C-alpha cells in the first residue's frame, strides 16, 4: 500500500477526477487511466502469453459496477489455481516483482514502473478470515466473466458473491452501494446468490433492506 503523502493524495484526487469524467466510456479494465491502465496493459501481456483467463475483482470492479465513489490503490485479480505458478514466472520477466509472502498468504506482485500492487485471488481458496472463513471457495475466473488472454471485470452477480464471501465491513458497505446503484439487477443478484449458498442469500436479504432504508432517508 502506498504511503499517504501530499503527492500521493494529489494523484488520488486527480485519478478520481479522471474516473468521474470518463465514467460513461470506461467499460473495460483496458480503459482505466494513468498508472492503473499501464498495469492492466502489462497484465494483459502476461495473460496473452499464457492464454490465461483472469477476472478483475476488488475495488475496481466495485467502481465499474456503479459505486463511483470507490477508488482503490491495488488491483485484485482472480486466477485459475493451476496457472498461478506460471503466471508468476512470466510476470517476473514482464515488468513485475514477485513479492515474498508468509505461508498461507495469497500471492502478490508489484508493477515495477508504477508501484501498483496486484493481489492474486486463487481459484479454490477460501475467502473470509481465519476466525470466520467463508462457506464457499473462489470460483474459476471463467465462471466470473473472464476470458483467456485478456483481463475482464467480474460480473455484478459474481462480484456480490465474492463480497458476501469476504464479509468484512467494507465489503458489506460496497454491497449496499452496489445495490443502490443497480436496483434493476437486484432480482438477478438474488437468484445468483441463492444458488451459491443459503448463508449468502440471508446476508444479502439484510443488505437489501439496508440499501432500501438508505434510499428512503
Which stretches of residues belong to each language-model region?
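Compositionally biased terminal segments of proteins
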Residues: 2-217
Amino acid at each position: 500500500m502506498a504511503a499517504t503523502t501530499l503527492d500521493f493524495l494529489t494523484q488520488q484526487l486527480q485519478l478520481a477526477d479522471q474516473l468521474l469524467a470518463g465514467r460513461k466510456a470506461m467499460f473495460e479494465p483496458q480503459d482505466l487511466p494513468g498508472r492503473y491502465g499501464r498495469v492492466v496493459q502489462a497484465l494483459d501481456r502476461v495473460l496473452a502469453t499464457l492464454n490465461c483467463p483472469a477476472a478483475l475483482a476488488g475495488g475496481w470492479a466495485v467502481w465499474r459496477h456503479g459505486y463511483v465513489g470507490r477508488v482503490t490503490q491495488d488491483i485484485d485479480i482472480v486466477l485459475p489455481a493451476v496457472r498461478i505458478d506460471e503466471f508468476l514466472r512470466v510476470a517476473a520477466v514482464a515488468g513485475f516483482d514477485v513479492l515474498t509472502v508468509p505461508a498461507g498468504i495469497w500471492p502478490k506482485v508489484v508493477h515495477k514502473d508504477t508501484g501498483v500492487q496486484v493481489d492474486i485471488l486463487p481459484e479454490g481458496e477460501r475467502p473470509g478470515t481465519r476466525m470466520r472463513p467463508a462457506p464457499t471457495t473462489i470460483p474459476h475466473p471463467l465462471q466470473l466473466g473472464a476470458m483467456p488472454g485478456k483481463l475482464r471485470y467480474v460480473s455484478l452477480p459474481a462480484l456480490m458473491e465474492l463480497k458476501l464471501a469476504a464479509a468484512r465491513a467494507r465489503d458489506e458497505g460496497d454491497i449496499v452501494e452496489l445495490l443502490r446503484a443497480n436496483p434493476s439487477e437486484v432480482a438477478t443478484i438474488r437468484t445468483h446468490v441463492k444458488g451459491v449458498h443459503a448463508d449468502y442469500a440471508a446476508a444479502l436479504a439484510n443488505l437489501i433492506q439496508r440499501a432500501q432504508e438508505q434510499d428512503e432517508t
